């Protein structure tokens, strides 16, 4: 038997919004330590890794480890039926072919329950190696979303250049070019408004904006985003989820030959 109750049910709604446009179906791995998910997007270009720790839920019970195959669009449709202040409970019997979602209003006067059919998925887990990165940029998540959205008007790809003093986002296309430079902030009252850069060596890499715009759908989950970059390995875009862990997106840089084609 598995049961997890989340008083701040809106977190789960935001998690699904952050994932559903990128991945259509995924295995949710449920263990005593929490819920995790790892999946390539449908075009096998990017990778998503989600961790929700058990101690971040208000109550959590998992009698035995299980993996449940979920169609993300179906789960998203059901979670849309929950109000943003509802308490959400997920429940599944061992080896069940459905999962139950219960939505309770804060005053307990309205309780809805939905049963969703599970899928039989056979997904191979990819090992994600621990990496040291040349540049780690921490910045407001809303700012990153806006830069990606704005530069999408100019071109299909963004060049991210990281140096000690700041980070530059550049795009070019038929109508011209666009550049956004963010300097490292020295003194900010609110930590989430700061731009901080930890740099071992400068990095300049090119990424497809289409995917970055999918990643920024996680913006409501966290006030800050962390970008980790090194030459020739995937960019990591990480959103911390309060008290629960994170969602991380991995995207390989575009290679010069691709840009020319």
Curated annotation (Swiss-Prot):
Source domain of life? Eukaryota
Q: Which residues bind DNA?
A: 61-80
Which GO MF terms are attached to this record?
A: DNA binding; DNA polymerase processivity factor activity
Q: Which InterPro entries match?
A: DNA_clamp_sf, Pr_cel_nuc_antig, Pr_cel_nuc_antig_C, Pr_cel_nuc_antig_CS, Pr_cel_nuc_antig_N
Q: Name one GO cellular component term.
A: PCNA-p21 complex
On modification after translation, the UniProt record reads: Monoubiquitinated by the ube2b-rad18 complex on Lys-164. Monoubiquitination at Lys-164 also takes place in undamaged proliferating cells, and is mediated by the dcx(dtl) complex, leading to enhance PCNA-dependent translesion DNA synthesis.
Primary location: nucleus
- Which processes are annotated in GO (biological process)? DNA damage response; leading strand elongation; mismatch repair; positive regulation of protein catabolic process; regulation of DNA replication; translesion synthesis
Q: Which UniProt keywords apply?
A: DNA replication, DNA-binding, Isopeptide bond, Nucleus, Ubl conjugation
Membership in a protein family: Belongs to the PCNA family.
Q: Which PANTHER family match?
A: PROLIFERATING CELL NUCLEAR ANTIGEN
Instruction: Spell out the HAMAP family in the cross-references.
Output: DNApol_clamp_arch
Quaternary state and interactors: Homotrimer. Forms a complex with activator 1 heteropentamer in the presence of ATP. Component of the replisome complex. Interacts with apex2.L (via PIP box and GRF-type Zinc finger domain); the interaction is required for 3'-5' single-strand break (SSB) end resection, assembly of a checkpoint protein complex to SSB sites, and SSB signaling.
| Annotated function | This protein is an auxiliary protein of DNA polymerase delta and is involved in the control of eukaryotic DNA replication by increasing the polymerase's processibility during elongation of the leading strand. Promotes 3'-5' nuclease activity of the DNA-endonuclease apex2.L in response to DNA damage.
- What is the protein's name according to its record? Proliferating cell nuclear antigen
Q: List the source organism.
A: Xenopus laevis
Please name the gene that encodes this protein. Answer: pcna
